[in-house]
Design a protein with these regions (language model features):
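Short coil/turn segments at secondary-structure boundaries
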Residues: 32-38, 66-70, 171-173, 181-185, ...
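Proline/serine/threonine-rich low-complexity "mucin-like" segments in extracytoplasmic/periplasmic regions
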Residues: 361-430
Length: 430
């Protein structure tokens, strides 16, 4: 029995099982309950989406690199159902899930929370801001990516280009407490490491998990209604159904606020740092993120139906966060590189049987969108080794734009603790 259980936990399956078991504990089941067994659990995982998650990571060409952690979580925006998770290559070799346990500095993926707070404060995308670089703002010496000085630009352009000086300035004027509150309302846990009321929080000094970020961005996709990510549809024991998923939606933002965020993040995809995501061939919104010393790289993106977060972090033999520089034989790694391409590979397959939907409410913000900007995935090419490696160029900016010429921002650990031995008391039903 022990050998059978151990074999079942091998590969990526163990991360799914352990995530389900952790959720059962949160729902009031004890470790003794789980060890006794007798449960029939129907999970939210989608077989096609899960296979796509595993394949997209493997196809990246870097999944086997020593110390590299790649995490992915994908959720249905209207119900919070987790349809796919990539926690690692083999649970038996490493029990810490890269999807819902390991954390990484969020970088510029936190800028949408500042946008929402600004919109609530009456600021709109056409407002003009000083995008000069360098600038000293509230005691912080800041540079834009590559120290590019944009001069006076609109907030929309600042979002597309991920202009650090504008966002730190805006966060200070709106109120850093409001930016922090916006992140929490969207779904980022209040106890997230590094989530503080500080102007630089907008540059991503907090360290969430991919499940945290997929859930938070799903709130925008769901037009301001938050649902908690879940891996469980039904729990039955002894023939009795003890739990059935009935998603509870909580209003986090007014519909108009979420719609404006969605519009801005669509422009990040069509005109800005998230351009790789156009490869899914349907309307998408999202944000890249990179961090100081290249210690993490993110892409968090969504369609109206599905939100997915992809994170890359790296650790040394002692579990300390180290730079991603050199991953895949290239230079610095940014959100527009491996994370965005893994996201695009995954979403193209996971959503292949879903209707293409437009984001509602976009026309209120002058969206002439031209979704012909979205390419046909059959003509899309992800990075291949070695000709399409991430750029080796970098700069000294405190917050990276997420494009392949950016240098990231912030400092924090991308580690998390793992404890306990593999258990196989409750077998998930994909």
């Amino acid at each position: 029995k022990a050998k059978s259980a151990k074999n079942y936990l091998a590969g990526t399956n163990g991360y799914l099982l352990e995530s389900v078991q952790r959720e059962m504990v949160r729902r009031g089941y004890s470790e003794d309950d789980l060890n006794v067994g007798g449960f029939r659990i129907v999970t939210t995982f989608d077989k096609n989406a899960q296979a796509a998650a595993v394949e997209s990571v493997k196809s990246s060409g870097v999944s086997d690199e020593k110390g590299l952690r790649i995490g992915l979580t994908s959720v249905k925006t209207d119900t919070g159902e987790v349809i796919a998770m990539y926690g690692g290559a083999d649970y038996l070799k490493n029990q810490l899930s890269n999807a819902d346990q390991a954390v990484g500095l969020a970088g510029s993926t936190f800028k949408p929370f500042a946008l929402a707070a600004a919109f609530e404060d009456g600021i709109d995308l056409s407002s003009t801001w000083d995008g000069s670089s360098p600038r000293t703002i509230r005691g912080y010496k800041l540079k834009n990516e590559g120290n590019v000085s944009y001069g006076n630009i609109s907030l929309l352009t600042a979002t597309e280009k991920s202009v650090n000086t504008v966002f730190v300035d805006m966060a200070g004027k709106v109120g850093v407490d409001k930016v922090k509150d916006s992140a929490i309302r969207a779904g980022v846990p209040a106890n997230t490491v590094g989530l503080v009321a500080d102007p630089t929080t907008v540059l991503g000094t907090a360290s969430p998990t991919t499940m945290d970020m997929a859930g938070a961005y799903a709130t925008f996709a769901n037009r301001g209604e938050r649902v908690t990510p879940t891996t469980i549809k039904e729990i039955a024991r002894g023939g009795t159904v003890e739990y059935e998923l009935n998603p509870t939606k909580q209003r986090a933002f007014d519909t108009e606020i979420a719609d404006e965020v969605n519009y801005a993040l669509q422009k990040v995809v069509t005109n800005g740092t998230g351009y790789a995501a156009t490869g899914i061939g349907r309307p998408a919104a999202g944000k890249t993120g990179t961090t100081d010393n290249n210690k993490s790289a993110w892409f968090v993106g969504y369609t109206p139906q599905v939100a997915t977060a992809v994170m890359l972090v790296k650790q040394d033999s002692k579990g300390n966060a180290i730079s991603l520089y050199g991953t895949g034989g290239g230079g610095s790694v940014h959100g527009a590189d491996y994370p965005a391409h893994i996201w695009t590979d995954y979403m193209s397959i996971a959503m292949s049987d879903m209707e293409s939907e437009d984001f509602q409410g976009s026309n209120d913000y002058g969206n002439d969108s031209g979704y012909n900007n979205y390419g046909n995935y059959n003509n899309y090419s992800r990075p291949s080794s070695p000709s399409s490696k991430p750029s080796s160029s970098s700069s000294g900016s405190p917050g990276g734009s997420g494009n392949s010429s950016s240098k990231p921002s912030g400092t924090a650990s991308s580690s998390a603790s793992a404890s306990g031995k593999p258990k196989a008391s409750a077998k998930p039903t994909p």
